[in-house]
Amino acid sequence: MVFAVTVLFNGCSYNFIVPIEVPVIDPDDPDAPQISFANDIIPIFVDNGNCSSCHNGSQVPDLRAENAYAAINTSRYINSATPGESRIYKYCSPETTTHMRKKYNSAQAALVLVWIQQGAKNN
């Protein structure tokens, strides 16, 4: 009995992941922080194999760090007139039903959308 209780209380441990807080950024605010493609968007694509595990050159778009901007900087993926309709945002958004594999979390989706709203610069 003592053994069972010991295993029960010591058998499991949890590492809680604190969600990243992303501030709401108004793209029309001239003082709003600029989203950086290199520092903010590329990590979404490559960290932990998020997107680049599949989109690694064998599947379009190629989202490896060195190729990502050239691969998505087309009207097929970025809709500058209606950023929320951009394929690079909408196809992997948390609410999508079209992309069954990995999706953006809400913080990542917000960063991608604001980056597009700010002009989708290669910065």
Where do the PLM segments sit?
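Sec-dependent bacterial lipoprotein signal peptides
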Residues: M1-S13
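Aromatic- and Gly/Pro-enriched helix-to-coil junctions and flexible linker segments
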Residues: C12-N123
